[in-house]
């Protein structure tokens, strides 16, 4: 293969990666919101698990699970609200752990496209987890805010328990030129 063919092949694969991430992003957000609504439905806090607000499939803006958290807290159902809020995060964690197991086990190592799909499914779910923690530990609304409020947790506790140690290790050890001076 000559240089021009290699560049063309790389460009095509880059477009496939972008399309895969956009598609998985939309699918994962849809599943995320449905897990909220299904959990609320199973706990008898929602009339239908399909009553979610669907948003934009590309920008992922406007999606909402339709759970009335504002009615749960005054009714003394904070723990229920926290359970409803945390369930999609458990799903993202399960997808990451399961996907990593499949990728590292070698089960699909010779199946290029299945490996590709599994890898990017893991990446998209990991991005969702990082978007929630540590980024939203101090949020007063949304999933993390509902978990903190519902369980009466300090955001500092959630931040410390859910921030992966390796994300801080570079600056803690001052390797790689990250320290001033």
Predicted regions and their residues:
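Short, Lys/Arg-rich, polar N-terminal cytosolic tail immediately upstream
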Residues: 1-10
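Short secondary-structure boundary micro-motifs
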Residues: 11-13, 67-68
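Select transmembrane alpha-helical segments in multipass membrane proteins
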Residues: 14-19
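Small-residue-rich helix-interface/hinge motifs
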Residues: 21-78
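Metalloprotease/metallohydrolase-associated module, dominated by Zn2+-dependent proteases
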Residues: 63-177
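Membrane-helix boundary/juxtamembrane motif in polytopic membrane proteins
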Residues: 179-181
């Amino acid at each position: 293969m000559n240089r021009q063919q290699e560049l063309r092949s790389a460009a095509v694969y880059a477009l496939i990666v972008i399309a895969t991430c956009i598609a998985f992003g939309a699918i994962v957000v849809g599943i995320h919101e449905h897990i909220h609504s299904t959990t609320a439905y199973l706990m008898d806090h929602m009339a239908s698990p399909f009553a979610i607000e669907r948003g934009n499939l590309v920008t992922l803006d406007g999606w909402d699970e339709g759970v009335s958290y504002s009615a749960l807290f005054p009714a003394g159902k904070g723990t229920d609200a926290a359970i409803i809020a945390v369930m999609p995060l458990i799903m993202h964690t399960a997808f990451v752990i399961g996907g990593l197991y499949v990728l590292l086990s070698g089960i699909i190592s010779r199946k290029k496209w299945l490996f590709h799909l599994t890898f990017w499914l893991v990446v998209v779910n990991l991005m969702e987890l990082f978007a929630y923690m540590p980024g939203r530990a101090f949020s007063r609304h949304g999933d993390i805010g509902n978990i903190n409020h519902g369980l009466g947790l300090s955001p500092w506790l959630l931040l410390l328990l859910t921030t992966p140690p390796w994300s801080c290790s570079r600056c803690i050890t001052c390797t790689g030129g990250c320290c001033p001076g």
